[in-house]
Amino acid sequence: LARAAGTNLQITALDPAGAVSWSNAYSNGVCTVESMAAPTNVGRFGAWIPQQNFFTTNPSSQGNFTPPAGNQFFRLRAVDLSTNSPAAFTNLINSYGILHTIAGNGDAGYADPGADVTNYWKPSFEGQLATNVALSRPHFAMEDDASNVYIVDKDSDSVLKVTTDGRIHTVAGIHSISNGPDGPTIATSVGMNTPNGLWVRGDGTFYVLDTGNGKVRKVNTSGIMTTLFTDSKGISGGRGLWVRSDEALIYYASGADLRRWTPTGGTVNLNTQFNDLGNIIMSGTNLVATDRGANTVWLVNTNTGVRTLLCGSGGEGLVVDGTPALTNSLYGVRGVWQPPTGGYFLADDYGAQLVFVDPAGILHLFVNGNNDDHAGDGEWFYQPAHYLFGQLRSVSMDNQGNLIIVENDEGYVRRIDFQRLSQ
């Protein structure tokens, strides 16, 4: 950690509730608020403890953290993530900390863990610790601004919610295949059919790609579900879903087709040149889409539908760390997320690797994996020589910078803390 080169990095305001402002940070970097307890004896100072990281995209900004109890000293540190810095990737990995499992027990106790088209849900799971519960091929997880994690659990035909106390609750679906009503109905009374796409707003409103029924459904903060639209052509494959906050624009995946829906124009194909789409995100005014079947990642112009290759050679091997993303095999790539400072996190299904592609297009191995491996809980996430993940389904980022990953046929949701470890 170092002072931003050539600047006077400083805290400009700090209140007791943890609202902090700063100036002269890196315009592409991370700021870390650290604290140290005031000494009880003269000269007996303790260690500086990282409290909160913030991505920085401007020299001056602000954020909020929870101050520790008691009298404290505070300081602000900064690192550069720009590709002009030779330490950019090192700075990124050192800004992340511990790997956790937050949901799933690997279908423990079942003779056929991780089997496709198998519903492992039991009524007794309701309200239990999420790490004691068997998931059924979960496909995507995303967090709201209150730190609740929503999971679309494909083969239990439901959406599950892990609350901040670590317990799991059904928030949509009846845990069996059905085609529930389209009008306003309590979400836990509405049957769905292999839902596998999800989009969550900060206030806890969420949207579900009810793939088997060819529908996009909404659940409001009162737990009421309505169908926004039904695709008359049906939805094949599914997975990718993105919803604008005013609900007037929705993009979703259907096999080879990337589709757009608006209230006035209905459903149209934006691009039909894919093999087997995975997840999608918005990047500026354009879309980024993964093609699991072609092992590639594309930028799609939302006005014309024209696509441009971003990452992937189409090969079926493992990635080569530190080399151009365009020349790399991204075997079964299906997850994608963009951090505030640019670049992309990509999650490979068959390759079982989580990678980061920096803004210069260089690929870096972030977390290694293999088949159905699952390891590393409670440890620093960056262990490239060890397999910590199984096959990956998705990656997303919450509003605090933590990474949420769905991995392994046997059903786990993991989190990597955006929290620097103490030195």
State where each predicted segment sits.
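Short, composition-biased motifs enriched in small/polar/acidic residues
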Residues: 1-95
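Blade-level signature of beta-propeller repeat domains, shared across WD40, Kelch, NHL, RCC1
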Residues: 391-423
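Short loop/turn segments immediately following beta-strands, especially the blade-tip
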Residues: 37-41, 303, 416-423
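Conserved beta-propeller blade signature
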Residues: 148-151, 205-208, 249-252, 286-289, ...
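Short loop/turn segments immediately following the C-termini of beta-strands
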Residues: 154, 211-212, 253-255, 292, ...
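Residue-level detector of Asp-centered blade-edge/turn motifs that repeat once per structural unit
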Residues: 143-146, 200-203, 243-247, 282-285, ...
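Gly/Pro-rich loop segments of beta-rich domains
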Residues: 89-137, 167-194, 223-240, 264-278, ...
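A short loop-to-beta-strand structural motif that recurs across blades of beta-propeller domains
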Residues: 32, 157-161, 167-170, 214-218, ...
